[in-house]
């Protein structure tokens, strides 16, 4: 099954930390087969772990999360979306960080809703965006 919901890095952090609780509660109402993360998000999570080598609890929590969720490869369809989004945003003088652009492009390529509380994603035309931090 293709992911219906793509979790961004901040959303995954909320899930791992358990705060805000609304995010975990919403996740529990969705079949895990419909949830995924981008390989870009996986890279960001692993970078966060590498930055805190003295936090074995964080490493365990991230590893356990990655075992439970499908990590979706960033592919040529996502690359096509990335080019279009980046061009559009730069034309309007509204640049976005490359990793966020890659995650947004991945969600568009998958036709999935991006789960994020980051309002910057609202600038991406056609992106289905859901904020699970609000109950």
Regions found by a protein language model. Give the residues of each.
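Residues at the C-termini of beta-strands that transition into short coil/loop
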Residues: 39, 75, 118, 133
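Beta-alpha-beta core module
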Residues: 124-134
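A secondary-structure boundary/capping signal
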Residues: 8, 38-41, 117, 125
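Generic structural signal for small/hydrophobic residues in well-ordered secondary structure
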Residues: 8-9, 23, 45, 82, ...
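Short, well-structured N-terminal submotif of metal-dependent ribonuclease cores
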Residues: 1-37, 47-66, 133-135
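Alpha-helix capping/helix-boundary segments
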Residues: 11-12, 41, 78, 103, ...
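Active-site neighborhoods of divalent-metal-dependent phosphate/nucleic-acid chemistry enzymes
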Residues: 3, 70-115
């Amino acid at each position: 099954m293709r992911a219906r919901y793509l979790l961004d890095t901040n959303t995954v952090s909320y899930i791992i930390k358990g705060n805000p609780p609304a995010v975990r509660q919403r996740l529990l109402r969705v079949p895990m087969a419909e949830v995924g993360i981008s390989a870009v998000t996986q890279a960001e999570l692993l970078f966060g772990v590498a930055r805190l080598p003295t936090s074995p609890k964080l490493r365990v929590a991230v590893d356990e999360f990655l075992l439970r969720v499908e990590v979706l490869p960033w592919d040529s369809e996502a690359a096509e979306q990335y080019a279009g989004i980046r061009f559009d945003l730069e034309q309007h003088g509204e640049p976005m960080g490359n990793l966020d652009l890659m995650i947004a492009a991945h969600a568009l390529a998958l036709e999935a809703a991006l789960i994020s509380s980051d309002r910057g994603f609202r600038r991406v035309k056609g992106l289905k965006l859901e904020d699970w931090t609000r109950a």
